[in-house]
């Protein structure tokens, strides 16, 4: 059994900070305390990739001298010689420092450095007697003094909220956190490349909207001082992107932030990243095929495979995604129902009441059969959709921007994609009939007046754009944060957002 020292107390930390501030004061007295004239020419990962396979004889013959810089994470002083571990943006490399090479003054200065300091090393690459690749320091400099001590290696950043609040410390201390955000970057890069390869134009649309639209959500409200008008942080870019389709861009996409003034949960953050794309002359069937491949390619870009492990269960994105209607999903995943029961509004309403839903309040009080079936699906089946599954054929009353089916009354050409019981994407054949769209906006206004805070506003300019004519179009939005959760085996959306929102510190 190994004994571990207790975690440092606040008093200990304050004492260490005071000692480090005193060291910094002495540095200021002797010259430039924070120099900015060192440029590294190598990174730890590159050195390991190039030289781990060579023995000392080959390294001596190669006579490779490098300049590296990074944070000192470990330090072992053994009289006239010392070892340190340097961590840069790519990984870690061992540093060997000795008094005979550095000189008395430089070696004495090194001994005063602290864990967390940013240092610069120049010297040859070699291997120790134990075979560890290292850099033998011919020169060593302190570039940036760390005033706050890092968490010790054993205790690390144990407080989950502290990891979110001080993500910079989490990134320093936790390899898994760095890998998560590297994977996120690769996933977004893979999505962007897939879109560009498919002929889509990347665009940027406003973040401040005079009318919130494009989704059913409660917006953040602000004020534009120069124009003296109320504005809203966007809840979705949809209506602006479709204006671009009207304008003649046939394929557009945007990766950017949305803001919804709603709750926080492991799946929800008020500020989140979406990728929305729109393609002229495409319908929702084409969208499902394209979205399936897009997500598969993002997984491969981020992890190297389309077969993943999420929360100790296999998640296979390599196979065709399932497609079910709302009722088919209920019958498959929620036991005990018949189609006849699902077709009875009174029965569905009674079932929702049993499940604790407020069927007397908005929006269910005014809901038709389709909306009631959707609510029952959300209560009984949604969380069970582990396999990638498209739920299709949503009712018109909950899909105010989607094209109605030509063959089924009250149904739209819309889908939502669920993976591991979470909504990942939402898409549909777009409604391009301006008169139908205006009528649906009016119905949304009535719902808002009846107490539905998430109902949409009437956007007259969007109707005007449609009146110029929009080609048949398909559009889809993908939640980047939720997708990255899957790709990185992260249980909470906060784990994949660098700086999630938290309550103010006391």
Curated annotation (Swiss-Prot):
One of its GO terms (cellular component) is cytosol. It catalyses: tRNA(Lys) + L-lysine + ATP = L-lysyl-tRNA(Lys) + AMP + diphosphate. InterPro entries: Aa-tRNA-synt_II (IPR004364), aa-tRNA-synth_II (IPR006195), aa-tRNA-synth_II/BPL/LPL (IPR045864), Lys-tRNA-ligase_II (IPR002313), Lys-tRNA-ligase_II_N (IPR044136), Lys-tRNA-synth_II_C (IPR018149), NA-bd_OB-fold (IPR012340), NA-bd_OB_tRNA (IPR004365). The keyword S-adenosyl-L-methionine does not apply. It is found in: Cytoplasm. It is an enzyme of class 6 (ligase). GO terms for biological process: lysyl-tRNA aminoacylation. Mg(2+) 2 binds at residue 423. Binds 3 Mg(2+) ions per subunit. GO terms for molecular function: ATP binding; lysine-tRNA ligase activity; magnesium ion binding; tRNA binding. It comes from the Bacteria. Keywords: Aminoacyl-tRNA synthetase, ATP-binding, Cytoplasm, Ligase, Magnesium, Metal-binding, Nucleotide-binding, Protein biosynthesis. Mg(2+) 1 binds at residues 416, 423. Its EC number is 6.1.1.6. The keyword Ligase applies. Its cofactor is Mg(2+). Pfam families: tRNA-synt_2, tRNA_anti-codon. Gene3D superfamilies: Bira Bifunctional Protein, Domain 2, Nucleic acid-binding proteins. Homodimer. Belongs to the class-II aminoacyl-tRNA synthetase family. NCBIfam families: lysS_bact, PRK00484.1. This is Lysine--tRNA ligase. It comes from Bordetella bronchiseptica (strain ATCC BAA-588 / NCTC 13252 / RB50) (Alcaligenes bronchisepticus).
